[in-house]
Amino acid sequence: VYKRQPQELLKTYGTERQPAAQNLIDFDKEWSSLMADPNATQEVADYYVEAEAFAAGMMTEYSQNLVVSDTAHQDLATGFPVGRRFKSAIATRRCDARKLHLGHEHQADGRWRIYAFADTDKTKLNEWAKSFNLPVDFADIKVIYQQPCHDIEVLDAPELFRPKVGTLNIPMWENVWTGEDIFAERGISRDGAVVVVRPDQYVAGVFPLDESVENFFKRLRDPQTVE
Protein backbone atom coordinates (compact mmCIF):
# COMPACT_ATOMS: atom_id res chain seq x y z
CA VAL A 1 0.00 0.00 0.00
CA TYR A 2 2.84 2.41 0.88
CA LYS A 3 3.01 5.17 -1.77
CA ARG A 4 1.12 3.01 -4.27
CA GLN A 5 -2.45 3.21 -2.96
CA PRO A 6 -4.31 5.82 -0.91
CA GLN A 7 -4.18 5.25 2.84
CA GLU A 8 -8.00 5.19 2.83
CA LEU A 9 -7.62 1.67 1.47
CA LEU A 10 -6.53 0.44 4.90
CA LYS A 11 -9.86 1.49 6.40
CA THR A 12 -11.78 -0.84 4.10
CA TYR A 13 -10.44 -3.83 6.01
CA GLY A 14 -12.44 -2.86 9.08
CA THR A 15 -15.53 -1.66 7.25
CA GLU A 16 -15.69 -4.92 5.27
CA ARG A 17 -14.69 -7.46 7.88
CA GLN A 18 -16.73 -6.19 10.84
CA PRO A 19 -20.13 -6.88 9.24
CA ALA A 20 -18.83 -10.19 7.86
CA ALA A 21 -17.63 -11.21 11.31
CA GLN A 22 -20.98 -10.27 12.87
CA ASN A 23 -22.82 -12.37 10.29
CA LEU A 24 -20.58 -15.30 11.15
CA ILE A 25 -21.23 -14.88 14.88
CA ASP A 26 -24.99 -14.78 14.25
CA PHE A 27 -24.72 -17.89 12.09
CA ASP A 28 -22.76 -19.76 14.76
CA LYS A 29 -25.34 -18.87 17.42
CA GLU A 30 -28.24 -20.13 15.34
CA TRP A 31 -26.36 -23.24 14.23
CA SER A 32 -25.24 -24.17 17.76
CA SER A 33 -28.79 -23.67 19.07
CA LEU A 34 -30.15 -26.08 16.49
CA MET A 35 -27.42 -28.62 17.17
CA ALA A 36 -28.22 -28.51 20.89
CA ASP A 37 -31.88 -29.37 20.29
CA PRO A 38 -32.28 -33.19 20.14
CA ASN A 39 -35.67 -32.79 18.44
CA ALA A 40 -34.42 -30.60 15.61
CA THR A 41 -32.97 -33.33 13.40
CA GLN A 42 -34.78 -32.25 10.23
CA GLU A 43 -34.27 -28.57 10.99
CA VAL A 44 -30.51 -29.16 11.29
CA ALA A 45 -30.42 -30.92 7.93
CA ASP A 46 -32.48 -28.21 6.22
CA TYR A 47 -30.44 -25.40 7.76
CA TYR A 48 -27.18 -27.05 6.73
CA VAL A 49 -28.29 -27.24 3.10
CA GLU A 50 -29.52 -23.64 3.11
CA ALA A 51 -26.37 -22.30 4.76
CA GLU A 52 -23.81 -24.43 2.91
CA ALA A 53 -22.65 -21.59 0.64
CA PHE A 54 -22.43 -19.20 3.59
CA ALA A 55 -20.43 -21.66 5.68
CA ALA A 56 -18.04 -22.11 2.75
CA GLY A 57 -17.47 -18.36 2.63
CA MET A 58 -19.20 -17.88 -0.72
CA MET A 59 -22.05 -15.66 0.50
CA THR A 60 -20.00 -12.83 1.96
CA GLU A 61 -20.98 -9.63 0.15
CA TYR A 62 -19.06 -6.41 0.66
CA SER A 63 -20.84 -3.08 0.36
CA GLN A 64 -19.74 -0.22 -1.85
CA ASN A 65 -16.45 1.37 -0.79
CA LEU A 66 -13.11 2.43 -2.24
CA VAL A 67 -12.48 -1.02 -3.72
CA VAL A 68 -16.09 -2.06 -4.43
CA SER A 69 -18.04 -0.12 -7.03
CA ASP A 70 -21.77 0.46 -7.17
CA THR A 71 -24.04 -2.01 -8.95
CA ALA A 72 -25.28 0.34 -11.67
CA HIS A 73 -24.06 -2.03 -14.39
CA GLN A 74 -24.64 -5.36 -12.67
CA ASP A 75 -27.03 -6.36 -15.46
CA LEU A 76 -24.05 -6.63 -17.83
CA ALA A 77 -22.73 -9.67 -15.93
CA THR A 78 -25.36 -11.02 -13.56
CA GLY A 79 -23.32 -14.13 -12.75
CA PHE A 80 -20.55 -12.08 -11.16
CA PRO A 81 -22.27 -10.24 -8.28
CA VAL A 82 -20.38 -7.12 -7.22
CA GLY A 83 -18.94 -7.48 -3.73
CA ARG A 84 -19.02 -11.28 -3.75
CA ARG A 85 -16.32 -13.84 -4.39
CA PHE A 86 -15.49 -14.38 -8.06
CA LYS A 87 -17.33 -17.49 -9.23
CA SER A 88 -15.09 -19.12 -11.80
CA ALA A 89 -16.23 -20.60 -15.09
CA ILE A 90 -14.56 -22.53 -17.89
CA ALA A 91 -13.23 -20.77 -20.99
CA THR A 92 -10.75 -21.71 -23.71
CA ARG A 93 -7.24 -20.29 -23.73
CA ARG A 94 -6.59 -19.49 -27.36
CA CYS A 95 -2.82 -20.03 -27.49
CA ASP A 96 -3.11 -23.74 -26.71
CA ALA A 97 -6.87 -24.36 -27.04
CA ARG A 98 -7.07 -25.66 -23.47
CA LYS A 99 -10.34 -25.43 -21.57
CA LEU A 100 -9.55 -24.07 -18.12
CA HIS A 101 -11.26 -22.37 -15.21
CA LEU A 102 -10.54 -18.65 -15.37
CA GLY A 103 -10.38 -18.47 -11.60
CA HIS A 104 -7.76 -21.21 -11.46
CA GLU A 105 -5.43 -18.93 -13.42
CA HIS A 106 -5.36 -16.45 -10.53
CA GLN A 107 -1.94 -16.27 -8.92
CA ALA A 108 -1.31 -15.05 -5.39
CA ASP A 109 0.80 -12.15 -6.64
CA GLY A 110 -1.19 -9.18 -5.31
CA ARG A 111 -2.40 -8.12 -8.75
CA TRP A 112 -5.90 -7.16 -9.80
CA ARG A 113 -7.69 -9.27 -12.41
CA ILE A 114 -9.54 -7.55 -15.24
CA TYR A 115 -11.74 -9.62 -17.56
CA ALA A 116 -12.85 -7.86 -20.72
CA PHE A 117 -15.75 -9.74 -22.30
CA ALA A 118 -15.90 -8.70 -25.94
CA ASP A 119 -18.99 -7.44 -27.71
CA THR A 120 -20.20 -9.55 -30.63
CA ASP A 121 -18.43 -7.64 -33.42
CA LYS A 122 -15.51 -6.58 -31.15
CA THR A 123 -15.91 -2.88 -32.05
CA LYS A 124 -16.41 -1.62 -28.49
CA LEU A 125 -13.65 -3.86 -27.17
CA ASN A 126 -11.12 -2.61 -29.71
CA GLU A 127 -11.94 1.03 -29.00
CA TRP A 128 -11.74 0.51 -25.24
CA ALA A 129 -8.42 -1.30 -25.50
CA LYS A 130 -6.85 1.63 -27.35
CA SER A 131 -7.16 3.97 -24.38
CA PHE A 132 -7.12 1.67 -21.33
CA ASN A 133 -3.89 0.45 -19.80
CA LEU A 134 -2.43 -0.54 -16.45
CA PRO A 135 1.07 -1.79 -15.58
CA VAL A 136 1.53 -5.55 -15.83
CA ASP A 137 2.72 -5.68 -12.23
CA PHE A 138 -0.55 -4.07 -11.10
CA ALA A 139 -3.18 -5.88 -13.15
CA ASP A 140 -3.59 -9.06 -15.16
CA ILE A 141 -5.86 -8.14 -18.08
CA LYS A 142 -7.57 -10.88 -20.08
CA VAL A 143 -10.01 -10.79 -22.99
CA ILE A 144 -12.75 -13.36 -23.57
CA TYR A 145 -14.34 -13.45 -27.02
CA GLN A 146 -17.78 -14.83 -27.83
CA GLN A 147 -16.61 -16.66 -30.94
CA PRO A 148 -15.39 -20.29 -31.04
CA CYS A 149 -11.71 -20.84 -30.38
CA HIS A 150 -10.55 -21.30 -33.96
CA ASP A 151 -12.42 -18.24 -35.19
CA ILE A 152 -10.07 -16.01 -33.20
CA GLU A 153 -6.33 -15.51 -33.67
CA VAL A 154 -4.13 -14.36 -30.79
CA LEU A 155 -2.52 -11.70 -32.96
CA ASP A 156 -5.94 -10.22 -33.76
CA ALA A 157 -6.35 -9.20 -30.12
CA PRO A 158 -5.35 -5.63 -29.18
CA GLU A 159 -1.85 -5.20 -27.76
CA LEU A 160 -3.38 -4.51 -24.34
CA PHE A 161 -3.94 -8.26 -24.05
CA ARG A 162 -0.48 -9.17 -25.38
CA PRO A 163 1.88 -7.29 -23.06
CA LYS A 164 5.62 -7.80 -23.41
CA VAL A 165 7.11 -9.18 -20.22
CA GLY A 166 10.44 -10.20 -18.78
CA THR A 167 13.94 -9.04 -19.63
CA LEU A 168 13.51 -10.26 -23.21
CA ASN A 169 10.16 -8.49 -23.73
CA ILE A 170 8.41 -11.64 -24.84
CA PRO A 171 4.72 -11.16 -25.74
CA MET A 172 2.33 -12.88 -23.33
CA TRP A 173 -0.18 -14.90 -25.30
CA GLU A 174 -1.99 -16.46 -22.34
CA ASN A 175 -4.38 -13.51 -21.93
CA VAL A 176 -6.50 -14.17 -25.02
CA TRP A 177 -9.47 -16.46 -24.37
CA THR A 178 -12.67 -17.57 -26.05
CA GLY A 179 -15.80 -19.06 -24.57
CA GLU A 180 -19.25 -18.72 -25.99
CA ASP A 181 -20.61 -20.83 -23.12
CA ILE A 182 -19.35 -18.54 -20.35
CA PHE A 183 -21.46 -15.66 -21.67
CA ALA A 184 -24.64 -17.67 -21.15
CA GLU A 185 -23.46 -19.38 -17.97
CA ARG A 186 -22.60 -16.12 -16.21
CA GLY A 187 -25.25 -13.87 -17.73
CA ILE A 188 -22.79 -11.68 -19.62
CA SER A 189 -24.19 -9.13 -22.04
CA ARG A 190 -23.52 -9.72 -25.73
CA ASP A 191 -22.72 -6.00 -25.89
CA GLY A 192 -19.65 -6.71 -23.80
CA ALA A 193 -18.64 -6.04 -20.21
CA VAL A 194 -15.62 -5.63 -17.98
CA VAL A 195 -15.43 -7.56 -14.72
CA VAL A 196 -12.84 -6.28 -12.24
CA VAL A 197 -11.65 -8.70 -9.57
CA ARG A 198 -9.62 -7.72 -6.52
CA PRO A 199 -6.42 -9.50 -5.46
CA ASP A 200 -8.46 -11.37 -2.83
CA GLN A 201 -10.73 -12.72 -5.61
CA TYR A 202 -13.78 -10.62 -4.74
CA VAL A 203 -15.58 -8.84 -7.58
CA ALA A 204 -14.84 -5.13 -7.34
CA GLY A 205 -17.10 -4.03 -10.15
CA VAL A 206 -18.90 -4.69 -13.41
CA PHE A 207 -18.59 -2.02 -16.08
CA PRO A 208 -19.39 -1.37 -19.72
CA LEU A 209 -16.56 -1.16 -22.23
CA ASP A 210 -15.93 2.54 -21.64
CA GLU A 211 -14.05 5.01 -19.45
CA SER A 212 -15.86 3.93 -16.27
CA VAL A 213 -13.24 1.21 -15.74
CA GLU A 214 -10.45 3.76 -15.90
CA ASN A 215 -12.33 6.07 -13.54
CA PHE A 216 -12.63 3.28 -10.97
CA PHE A 217 -8.89 2.69 -10.95
CA LYS A 218 -8.02 6.36 -11.08
CA ARG A 219 -9.12 6.88 -7.49
CA LEU A 220 -6.82 4.04 -6.47
CA ARG A 221 -3.80 5.22 -8.42
CA ASP A 222 -4.09 9.01 -8.59
CA PRO A 223 -0.85 10.38 -7.03
CA GLN A 224 -2.87 13.16 -5.39
CA THR A 225 -4.72 10.58 -3.28
CA VAL A 226 -1.53 8.83 -2.20
CA GLU A 227 0.34 10.41 0.69
Q: What are the residue ranges of the model-derived segments?
A:
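Helical substrate-recognition/capping region of FAD-dependent monooxygenase/halogenase enzymes
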Residues: 3-227
